[in-house]
C-alpha cells in the first residue's frame, strides 16, 4: 500500500520537508484522518497468540478499542479529529486489490500451518497478513464516532484524496495517514504516526509537500510521475527500477512519457515495461480523483457533545468493554471537547492565499531547479563516459 521507498527518498533528498515532534505540538488543530488505514492498524495489533481482541461472544473488538482510545488521546492533546472513510475503489485499483486478496489467502494457509508447527513469531506474522477491514468494521466505527461526537465522512473513492481536498481548502490543518500516496493527491501537509499507540513512542512526522518538491527540484507532475515509477496501488512497478533509478530517470528525462520512450529504445533492453501499464490513467487519478468538493454541505463538520449513556450501552453492554472505564473516559472526552474549543494563536490570523503571480513564480523556481538537476545528471553521465573511454595508464 502506498508508494514504495518514497519516504526514504524524501529523507535523503529533501530532509527539510520532514519535521518530527510530539503529539502536543498539534494542539488546537483540525486534522482529517484516513479512517480505513487507521482501522487496519488497530486490527493488526494482535496478541502473541495471533488472536485479535475479542469479547465473550467471540466478536472482534480491536477496531473499536483502537478507535475509541486513540481518538481520546488526540482530543486529550487538543486535536480536533475528523475521519474520512474509503468509498468504492477506482477501477484501476482492482488489480492491486486482487493481489492483496491472494496474499491474504496464502497467509491464511500459512497461519494454519504455523499454528501447528511454527513459532509464536510465525503465528503473529501470518495473522497480520490475514487482516482485512470489512464493511462491518467501518459501520461499527462510524457508530462509535457518532456517539463520541466526532465527525466523519465517506469519500466517493479514496479517503486520502478526500483528506487532501479538505487540507488544501483549509478545512483542516493536515491529512493524517500512513499512506505516502496522500502526497500525490497534493495535501499541503501529511501527518504520520498520529494514530499510533503511545507505547510505541514514535514521534509524529509532519511532511510538507512544498518542501518535498523544492528539495527534489520537481514540479507536481514530475513528483507524481516519480511516485508511479516507484510503484503505487494502481500499477505494477517496472522490474529492475528501484528508488535510485526512478529518481535518476525522472530527473534526466523529465516526464514518464520520455522515460517510457527511452526504455523502449534502449539498445541493451534492460527494462521490460508491463504489457498493461496505463500510467496516464494512474496520473489522472492523482490529479483528478473522485472527491466531494470542500464546499459540499457534507464537508461542513461539527464536533458535538458525546453521548455518554450511548457509549456505555454500545461499548460496555453490547461489546463487553469495562463500564467503569468507558464511563470515566467518556466524561473526560466531554470535558476535553469543551476545552478544545480554544484555538491556536495562528487560528486568529487569516492566511492569505498566494496570488497567481506568486504561484507562477514558485512554479518557475521549481522548473529551474529541475532543469539544473537534469543538467547536473547529464554532465555526470558525460564525465563517467569520458573516464570509461580513457585508456588505462594514460
UniProtKB/Swiss-Prot annotation:
Phosphorylated. Phosphorylation upon DNA damage induces relocalization to the nuclear plasma. Residues 356-383 have a biased composition (Basic and acidic residues). Mg(2+) 2 binds at residues 179, 181, 233. Residues 341-349 are annotated as: Interaction with PCNA. The keyword Mitochondrion applies. One of its GO terms (molecular function) is 5'-3' exonuclease activity. Mg(2+) 1 binds at residues 34, 86, 158, 160. It comes from the Eukaryota. Residues 356-394 are annotated as: Disordered. Gene3D superfamilies: 5' to 3' exonuclease, C-terminal subdomain, 5'-nuclease. Residues 384-394 have a biased composition (Basic residues). It is found in: Nucleus, Nucleolus; Nucleus, Nucleoplasm; Mitochondrion. Binds 2 magnesium ions per subunit. They probably participate in the reaction catalyzed by the enzyme. May bind an additional third magnesium ion after substrate binding. GO terms for cellular component: mitochondrion; nucleolus; nucleoplasm. Its EC number is 3.1.-.-. HAMAP family: Fen (MF_00614). Structure-specific nuclease with 5'-flap endonuclease and 5'-3' exonuclease activities involved in DNA replication and repair. During DNA replication, cleaves the 5'-overhanging flap structure that is generated by displacement synthesis when DNA polymerase encounters the 5'-end of a downstream Okazaki fragment. It enters the flap from the 5'-end and then tracks to cleave the flap base, leaving a nick for ligation. Also involved in the long patch base excision repair (LP-BER) pathway, by cleaving within the apurinic/apyrimidinic (AP) site-terminated flap. Interacts with PCNA. Three molecules of FEN1 bind to one PCNA trimer with each molecule binding to one PCNA monomer. PCNA stimulates the nuclease activity without altering cleavage specificity. Belongs to the XPG/RAD2 endonuclease family. FEN1 subfamily. This is Flap endonuclease 1. It comes from Sordaria macrospora (strain ATCC MYA-333 / DSM 997 / K(L3346) / K-hell).
